[in-house]
Amino acid sequence: MAHHYHRVDELCRAYHVLPARQGGCVMDMLAITNLQKRFGDKSVLKGLDLSVPEHSVFGFIGKNGAGKTTTMKTILGLLKADGGEILVSGEKVVYGQTETNRHIGYLPDVPEFYPFMTAPEYLSFCGEITGMSRIEIKSRSNELLKLVGLGNEKHRIKVFSRGMKQRLGIAQALLNRPKLLICDEPTSALDPVGRKEILDILMAVREQTTVLFSTHILSDVERICTDVAFLNDGVVNIQGKLSDIKSQYRTEEYVLETGKEEELKLLMNVFAGLKKSGINTASFRENDHTLFDILRFVTDNRIRLLKIERVEPTLETLFMEVVEK
């Protein structure tokens, strides 16, 4: 039986899928190997590797100009790669051909529409282009417009807000039931309410498709993503499940808060490793002073401790660490 699992693991690696616990495989919906792209003398992608598991919500993180949009346009076959390979649902992407795009729904950062149409008219138009039947177009359009909160919207698209256009763009991208939904900076120009609406929709469609969205808004990623990748200087430095990455980079730093400033001063006089971080708060590393020593002193001296907790790594701290290396 052990030999069987070993063989399955080898096959999974060969065909860009992930080994599952029961000896089956979980497919990588998107697999990129050694992707390279140059514009003149400027090298934008320098051997990028990326694996996006099926039914994940995958955050593709990078600062402006890092190459996120270039990567996405290459996945769509709109840009010709200078090297490397891209597989979508196991099929190779070829520049200038659209075969693999039948698996993909795409939402650009600024979607464009025919302003004189209503939302149902626009989805009907898109459905006819893709060869859907009229019955399927009507059923799917109603389903998606309800999903994105536009089910009762009768106005023409020209009066839509930016957030409404983004939501319509998601509906259009999902119309043909794609296996992979690619969103390029979908929340970058939205207000907090609009951002929440888009993020809620992306989270809701996870059971239907795999979501890859690029962003530099790290709080959005922490809110909905199951997996992430950090793009910096043309390569992916870190990628994997968000929970695993946070666990891997967990520190031994703690923060505590006292009821009074005088109580914090007393603690800092006794424990030299405490560093003040606020009016009544201080941080420390466990190897400087154990939790037991501090808690015993707090108890013995009747210090009112409001909280003491481990400092969990944030995506911001991890990303800055990657960028500054």
For every predicted segment, state its role.
Residues 4-5, 15:
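Short, low-complexity segments with poor structural confidence in diverse proteins
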Residues 8, 32:
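Conserved catalytic Walker-motif region of ABC-type ATPase nucleotide-binding domains
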Residues 12-26:
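Short, Lys/Arg-enriched N-terminal segments with co-localized hydrophobic residues
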Residues 28-30, 37-232, 238:
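ABC transporter nucleotide-binding domains
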Residues 197-285:
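ABC transporter nucleotide-binding domain
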Residues 252-325:
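Short, charged/small-residue-rich alpha-helical element at the C-terminal edge
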